[in-house]
């Protein structure tokens, strides 16, 4: 009884320690308000966001149910967290229905909403509603066993799921369906005659732009609803959710009476594109920025690249591509061939701006070295090649302005409840007090500021979005409004502001247009708007001179850097009034949090742990270790339960299972959790087993892991796994029958194992190909194992340790050639090396197994192994082979693989080795006691993804391969034909 009490205290301590982690790692004093359908959980600093949901969530649910003509069946928690600094939200059924909202300032990607937080909630609520369109059977199942597993896991693709959300979010005139920047992706695909099939946008594609399943499915589902009504659409969902048809296409045909493929083709045919002018590189009206004299695209513009953050400065043009900032000197812009210079590498980038003089890059990036994602800013001194990190988070979209020869940093600060525009004076010589705040302005509710640019004289301009209304504002360094330019056309959406020679440049669109170019003459207060629709659109326009711009064109499968002469007849001028007074969108006084909400109370940490997943089977495993070896035997007859807090930080699980083979009962209790990313994760797992003689065994496992980003493209990963067992040994040599595996004696054994690994890795992309990566990983690993009999007589069987080293090198190409998009033939190579890899004893939890299976001598000791794989040829497929369902083919590859291994037969009384024992192994070599076995193979492989239900995701990719190999084992050459499967 005393032991049981201690165990309960330990479990309570652990659960209390990790009760608030993950997405609420720093939040205390959680509050809850229960509405008719939702439990809204939030920390005090999110009370304003909570107020929005308390007032609107129930109504949003009722409207959604009325739209689908379905009853309201569920109630679940909604968590609001301020910890995640990248605006988003998600719905999950694990381990019960729940929505988590990130209460932070949004980026331009959410410009399609006037009430961004509420609209994002409605998007996730649509997921919750459609995923829970259950019939009576699944409703009873949910009551008995919980919300997960759910039939949607095998029935609904991500494409279908997002089709419902994107179409619903747009039903009232906002949302992505009504946004021209979103439409651009579909329009451009149709312009290029490259419109995908339905299966191609089911979320199985690996290549960029890999998020297009949102857009294509959203417009398709909107088309279905408008042409055939919501009743049929709801029936399609109902049928698919309840698995009344095996495939999405089968359910569609039952409801609509014709094939999904035919509906998709009709939708593609009817999708309208605006009239496009004939300007192109081919006819010389547009120029390739890298080869302006050529009528064909340059290598840079035809290699599947994606360019961002194009900026013109007094020194020249900067842009970002594949992890690097590049520069083109202004004196080189008229050359017939232009080579961009690589400036520096950057990672986890959110935004990059450049000072007008071209001396500094201001980088907004995501910091992953924290329990949740943080947004930070660094300033890169281009001339001195020095990166200066600002030591605070919750800041973004920074840029430098210059006044009287001194620099000021302007940025958005969302570190508190109030979102502010801030201006700080920069002192590069003072490392301790690098920034000094000089002014700030509070943004009022539903107001967002983007694209800060220096316009000279200590003033800066930015795009101001208030609900769905845009304007261009000019502030001075004291955050006083100097001018505000209203836009001349209705429903204009503007982005990507830049400045050159007293002119502001921007991208714009309004209903029915492609993405066009606009300009503001700050001297004469004239706005000029392009009246042309150009294939690829005009993104990130920058002025080269008064009549020429450079820009990024977004084509269907790559972006291109182009430039174009601006003809006066293609521009329409508007004289606009400017306002030089305080705007209601901004305030000098901070807003206050709302008072305590009606029904608000303190949230109890364990309030939702009673909700979870109940499984009518045991997940307990009977482990045993002894002089005859180790065993793992399932105890499947039983019951299991798993739950977590509503924000998914900590999961608790328990299982009771019985196995007829061991005639024993096991109890498994565990907890796992940590940060919301790879910064820190843990698992604690306990198994206690009983048989007819009473207590049989107990084990405890503890796993810890952490990955910390260092420098720019590298990371340091640490993991430690400890395991302890004490108890009786199963009869491991028995044949499976009732009680056959039960221990033959009452002898008890103690087994201990600890494995530790440290890995430093560096990697960067060198091209568009999946194999175009260079980098390395290296690190030591240590394994300790101990086994002894503890009763009735103590006897040691194993006391072994091994310290080894692993390494990996990725070479992007052996041939100095660039491959065409979608093909690989420049021989990328990966090399792996293991020296005294600590994983070879029979008692290791993770026994490795060799690559080709030739080397089978269990007495042999692996000193080192070497593997090299060279891709001879690879081709991307990225297409479905069965139309609307079936398999999605990713790629096929032919490669050459070589594997070699050094083995020895060490003295029997030696059980511990490390890389410090090199002299001992040298002696073995001298005595010819080291043997080398190797194998070479040609591997034919192709990868596919099941395009069915929740399996339709690149994470579920399967690679099938066939090896034609020849092995040298001792003095024999052994041919082998081997078929294998690898999964992500």
Model-identified regions with their sequence ranges:
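Juxtacatalytic substrate-recognition/specificity segment
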Residues: 20-151, 165
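Beta/coil-rich, acidic/histidine-enriched accessory regions frequently appended to metallopeptidases
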Residues: 22-23, 29-32, 211, 235-358, ...
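Acidic/His/Gly-enriched intrinsically disordered linker/tail segments
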Residues: 25, 94-96, 109, 113-120, ...
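A flexible loop/linker signature enriched in serine peptidases of the S9 family
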Residues: 178, 320-326, 344-348, 364-377, ...
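Multi-bladed beta-propeller domains
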Residues: 277-305, 329-350, 379-402, 424-451, ...
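Outer-membrane beta-barrel initiation region
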Residues: 280, 294, 508, 560, ...
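Outer-membrane beta-barrel translocator/channel fold
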Residues: 512, 537-539, 556-558, 678-747, ...
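C-terminal outer-membrane beta-barrel translocator/porin domains of Gram-negative envelope proteins
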Residues: 733-899, 904-932, 936, 971-973, ...
């Amino acid at each position: 009884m005393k032991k049981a009490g201690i165990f309960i205290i330990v479990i309570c301590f652990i659960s209390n320690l990790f009760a608030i982690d993950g997405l609420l790692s720093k939040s205390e004093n959680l509050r809850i308000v229960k509405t008719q359908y939702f439990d809204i959980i939030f920390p005090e600093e999110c009370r304003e966001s909570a107020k929005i949901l308390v007032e609107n969530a129930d109504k949003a649910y009722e409207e959604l149910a009325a739209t689908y003509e379905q009853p309201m069946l569920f109630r679940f928690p909604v968590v609001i967290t301020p910890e995640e600094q990248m605006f988003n939200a998600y719905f999950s059924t694990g381990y019960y229905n729940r929505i988590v909202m990130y209460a932070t300032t949004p980026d331009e990607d959410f410009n399609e909403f006037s009430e961004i937080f509420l609209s994002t909630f409605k998007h996730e609520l649509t997921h919750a509603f459609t995923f829970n369109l259950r019939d009576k059977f699944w409703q009873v199942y949910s009551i008995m066993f919980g919300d997960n597993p759910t039939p949607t896991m095998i029935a609904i693709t991500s494409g279908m799921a997002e089709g419902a959300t994107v179409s619903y979010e747009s039903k009232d005139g906002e949302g992505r369906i009504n946004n021209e920047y979103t439409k651009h992706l579909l329009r451009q695909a149709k312009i290029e005659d490259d419109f995908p099939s339905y299966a191609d946008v089911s979320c199985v594609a690996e290549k960029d732009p890999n998020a297009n399943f949102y857009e294509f499915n959203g417009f398709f589902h909107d088309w279905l609803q408008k042409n055939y009504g919501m009743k049929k659409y709801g029936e399609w969902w109902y049928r698919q959710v309840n698995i009344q048809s095996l495939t999405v296409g089968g359910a569609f045909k039952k409801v609509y009476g014709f094939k999904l493929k035919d509906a998709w083709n009709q939708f593609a045919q009817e999708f309208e594109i605006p009239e496009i002018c004939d300007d192109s590189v081919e006819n010389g009206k547009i120029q390739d920025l890298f080869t302006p004299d050529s009528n064909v695209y340059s290598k840079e513009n035809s290699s599947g690249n994606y360019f961002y953050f194009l900026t013109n400065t007094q020194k020249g043009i900067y842009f970002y591509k594949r992890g690097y900032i590049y520069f083109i000197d202004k004196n080189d812009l008229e050359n017939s061939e232009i080579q961009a210079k690589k400036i520096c590498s950057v990672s986890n980038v959110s935004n990059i701006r450049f000072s007008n003089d071209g001396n500094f890059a201001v980088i907004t990036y995501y910091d992953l070295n924290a329990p949740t994602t943080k947004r930070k800013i660094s300033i890169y001194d281009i001339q001195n090649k020095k990166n200066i990190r600002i030591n605070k988070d919750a800041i973004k979209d920074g840029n430098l302005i210059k006044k009287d020869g001194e620099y000021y940093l302007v940025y958005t600060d969302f570190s508190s409840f109030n979102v502010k525009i801030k201006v700080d004076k920069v002192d590069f010589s003072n490392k301790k007090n690098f920034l000094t705040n000089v002014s700030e302005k509070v943004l009022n509710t539903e107001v967002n500021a983007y694209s800060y640019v220096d316009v000279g004289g200590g003033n800066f301009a930015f795009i101001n979005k208030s609900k769905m209304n845009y304007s261009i504002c000019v502030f001075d360094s004291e955050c006083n409004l100097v001018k505000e330019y209203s836009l001349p056309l209705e429903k204009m959406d503007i982005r990507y502001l830049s400045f050159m020679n007293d002119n502001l440049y921007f991208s714009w669109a309004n209903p029915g247009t492609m993405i066009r170019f606009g300009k503001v003459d700050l001297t004469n207060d004239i706005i000029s708007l392009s009246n042309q629709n150009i294939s690829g659109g005009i993104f990130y326009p920058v002025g080269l001179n008064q009549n020429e711009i450079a820009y990024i064109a977004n084509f269907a499968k790559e972006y291109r850097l182009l430039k174009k002469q601006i003809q006066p007849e293609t521009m329409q001028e508007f004289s606009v009034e400017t306002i030089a007074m305080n705007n209601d969108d901004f305030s000098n006084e901070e807003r206050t949090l709302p008072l305590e909400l009606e029904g608000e109370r303190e949230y109890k940490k364990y309030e939702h742990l009673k909700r979870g997943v109940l499984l009518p089977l045991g997940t307990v495993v009977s482990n045993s270790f002894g002089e005859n070896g180790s065993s793992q035997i399932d105890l499947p007859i039983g019951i299991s339960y798993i739950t977590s807090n509503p924000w998914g930080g900590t999961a608790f699980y328990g299982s009771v299972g019985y196995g007829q083979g061991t005639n024993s009962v096991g109890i498994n209790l565990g907890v796992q959790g940590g940060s919301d990313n790879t910064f820190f994760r843990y698992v604690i797992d306990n198994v206690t087993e009983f048989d007819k003689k009473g207590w049989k065994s107990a084990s405890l496992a503890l796993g810890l892991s952490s990955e910390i980003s260092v420098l720019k493209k590298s990371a340091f990963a640490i993991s430690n796994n400890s395991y302890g067992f004490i108890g009786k040994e199963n009869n491991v040599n028995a044949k499976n029958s009732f009680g056959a595996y039960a221990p033959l004696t009452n002898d008890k054994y103690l087994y201990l194992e600890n494995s530790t690994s440290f890995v430093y890795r560096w990697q960067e992309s060198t091209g568009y190909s999946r194999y175009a990566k260079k980098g390395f990983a290296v690190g030591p690993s240590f394994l300790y194992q101990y086994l002894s009999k503890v009763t009735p007589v103590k006897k040691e069987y194993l006391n072994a340790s091994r310290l080894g080293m692993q390494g990996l090198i990725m070479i992007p190409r052996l041939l100095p050639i660039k491959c065409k998009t979608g093909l690989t033939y420049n021989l990328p190579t990966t090399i792996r090396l293991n020296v005294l890899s600590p994983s070879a004893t029979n008692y290791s939890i993770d026994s490795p197994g060799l690559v080709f299976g030739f080397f089978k001598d269990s007495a042999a000791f692996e000193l080192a192994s070497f593997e090299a794989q060279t891709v001879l040829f690879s081709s991307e497929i990225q297409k479905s082979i069965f139309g609307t369902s079936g398999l999605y083919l990713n790629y096929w590859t032919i490669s050459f693989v070589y594997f070699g291994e050094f083995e020895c037969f060490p003295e029997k009384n030696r059980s511990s080795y490390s890389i410090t024992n090199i002299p001992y192994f040298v002696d073995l070599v001298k005595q010819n006691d080291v043997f080398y076995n190797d194998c070479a193979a040609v591997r034919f492989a192709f990868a596919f993804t099941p395009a069915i239900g929740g399996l339709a995701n690149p994470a579920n990719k399967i690679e099938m391969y066939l090896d034609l190999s020849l092995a040298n084992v001792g003095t024999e050459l052994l041919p082998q034909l081997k078929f294998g499967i690898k999964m992500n």
